[in-house]
From Swiss-Prot:
Species: Shewanella pealeana (strain ATCC 700345 / ANG-SQ1)
GO molecular function terms noted in the UniProt entry: rRNA binding; structural constituent of ribosome; transferase activity
Listed name of the protein: Large ribosomal subunit protein uL2
InterPro entries in the cross-refs: NA-bd_OB-fold, Rib_uL2_dom2, Ribosomal_uL2, Ribosomal_uL2_bac/org-type, Ribosomal_uL2_C, Ribosomal_uL2_CS, Ribosomal_uL2_dom3, Ribosomal_uL2_RNA-bd_dom
Domain of life according to the entry: Bacteria
Encoding gene, per UniProt annotation: rplB
GO cellular component: large ribosomal subunit
């Protein structure tokens, strides 16, 4: 995959940086693994905006991804790689020996024709899914479960991975990209290797309209509002806000910790690194 900086033939292309995925399927997705995806416009069931800056965008289908990788002992072949508008990673359509097709996250280096497998007997190679108890310490993995058979929750975005750094009894210790070290049951599954499409972080959309295509609406600064609308609003002329940055509801932002889940604190060995 290559990164291309476009020539400035128009203002919208002047800052455009694209990731060229020439190996992706150019046709339609596999219809049997699509689901309806309705847009909410950021509104809840009462019609009130609960998430700002959401609305519009291109119509999309949801791709049903196999995050459990529980089809053990049956080899599969990667038919093709596809773009998925619902995530930063690319996805792979795999065909199992019994004829079933599933979508999985495309691992780094995965290509059409590759053979993959799940289960405790699977080979230690990128794209194969095994329980953490069967993965060698020091291995790099992605799509990691937090509870056995629940489905992958950790390291699912483009270029993401975690490292298995220890295994003690019923738990394996993982080092996340943030620096956090966390315990996970050894019966949880993980896929070997990194998530592909790591170049996603290098892209630049180039113009505001590209954000609108993705369903993202403009963000108005608090200092540009009236006092009734935001704690930073009002004042004569331009102001800096006059206080530490807060949300429209007065919650400190830019680094303020809001995590409150004492039930799972015991699984965190070390907190993430400070930026």
């Amino acid at each position: 995959m290559a990164v291309i900086k476009c020539k400035p033939t128009s203002p919208g292309r002047r800052h455009l940086v694209k990731v060229v995925n020439s190996d992706l399927h150019k046709g339609k997705p596999f219809a049997g693994l699509l689901a309806k995806k309705s847009k909410s416009g950021g509104r809840n069931n009462t019609g009130r905006i609960t998430v700002r800056h959401i609305g519009g965008g291109h119509k999309q289908h949801y791709r049903l991804i196999d995050f459990k990788r529980n089809k053990d002992g049956i080899p599969a072949k990667v038919e093709r790689l596809e773009y998925d508008p619902n995530r930063t990673a690319n996805i792979a359509l795999v065909l199992y020996a019994d004829g079933e097709r599933r979508y999985i996250l495309a691992a780094k280096g995965m290509k059409a024709g590759d053979k993959i497998q799940s289960g405790i007997d699977a080979e230690i190679k990128s794209g194969n899914a095994l329980p953490l108890r069967n993965i060698p310490v020091g291995s790099v993995v992605h799509a990691v479960e937090m509870k056995p058979a629940k489905g992958a929750q950790i390291a699912r975005s483009a270029g993401a991975y975690v490292q298995v750094i220890a295994r003690d009894g019923a738990y394996a210790t993982l080092r996340l990209r943030s620096g956090e070290m966390r315990k996970v049951p050894v019966d949880c599954r993980a896929t070997l290797g990194e998530v592909g499409n790591a170049e996603h972080m290098l892209r630049q959309l180039g113009k505001a309209g590209a954000k609108r295509w993705r369903g993202v609406r403009p963000t108005v600064r608090g200092v540009a509002m009236n006092p009734v609308d935001h704690p930073h609003g009002g004042g004569e002329g331009r102001t800096s806000g006059g206080r530490h940055p807060v949300s429209p509801w007065g919650q400190p932002t830019k680094g303020y910790k809001t995590r409150s889940n004492k039930r799972t604190d015991k699984y965190i060995v070390r907190r993430r690194n400070k930026k």
